[in-house]
Structure formats: structure tokens, C-alpha cells
Amino acid sequence: MNFIVRHETPADVSDIYQVNHLAFDRDNEAQLVDVLRREKAVILSLVAVLDGQIIGHILFSPVSITNDKFQWQAVGLGPMAVLPEFQNQGIGSALIRSGLDELKKLGHDVVIVLGHPEYYPRFGFKPSKPFGIQWEIDVPEEVFMVAELWENALAGKQIGRAHV
């Protein structure tokens, strides 16, 4: 399959909504993308395109890690969606790898994700708890993960809770 990964354009908005809706079989993630876009809280939004059709989408947005004394910025991955008929064909992996590569080039150092613990470790994600980072609401430890885009990117960072 010969697809390309490129930046989202304004013409892609309705197709991106549809991809997220169909991939998750609900509107929550599609609506989240629209809200983040409307609030200008998007760092990077990429689409996978095959023969002119958007078949996948990934979005990265700012996340604050805070405690009583400190705050620092990370990047949140999600949602990431692939049309059901194109899942398990490497499209999601290509979107994640392209996104992480571009974020690194942009100078970002830490990415967090709330996702499947069997899937995301292949991209360098590890449970966040050993790094002292927790999600703003209680979630199972194994689904909240962090990736360092640079070696030792978390060294010296203050522990805290992640907030969108």
C-alpha cells in the first residue's frame, strides 16, 4: 500500500472528523479534535492519504505537567485514528513515527499518551509512574505512558500531574 503522511490542511477538517468517528465508533475523539483545533491547542496534526482519501489521522497537543511549585510543557499524543478497513496495515505506526520525528525536529522532548499498553511501547513509550508523572484523573497505570524524544529528556524534570 502506497500512502503518504502529510500535514492537515483546512480542506481536511470534515474528513478528519469522519476518520475519527469511524475509527472509534463514536464522536468523542472527533469532537476533541475539533475543540483542540478551535482553541488553537494543536502542535501537530498529520493525515495519512491513499489515492486522495484520508485514511488516518494523528494529533499532538500541549500538555502541562504541574505540581505545587513547578510547571513544564510536554506534548500529548491523541487521538490517533485509522479507518477500520485500513487498520493493522502499518498506517497508525507510520503516523506515530512521522509525528514523533517531526516533534523532535521542532525541539520537543517529552510526549505522553493515554493508550493501549501493548501498542505504544514499540515507539519508545514507557509507563509514566516511575517518572513521577500522573494523569489529571485516575487511570490504570499501564495505559498512561511517556516517551523521551531525546536521551534523558526527563532527567531533572519535576514530578507532577499532566493536564490538557
PLM regions and their residue ranges:
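Conserved active-site alpha-helix within GNAT-family acetyltransferase domains
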Residues: 105-109, 114-140
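A conserved beta-turn-beta hairpin within the catalytic core of GNAT-like acetyltransferases
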Residues: 63-76, 87, 106
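Non-DNA-binding regulatory cores of transcription-related proteins
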Residues: 131-147, 151-161
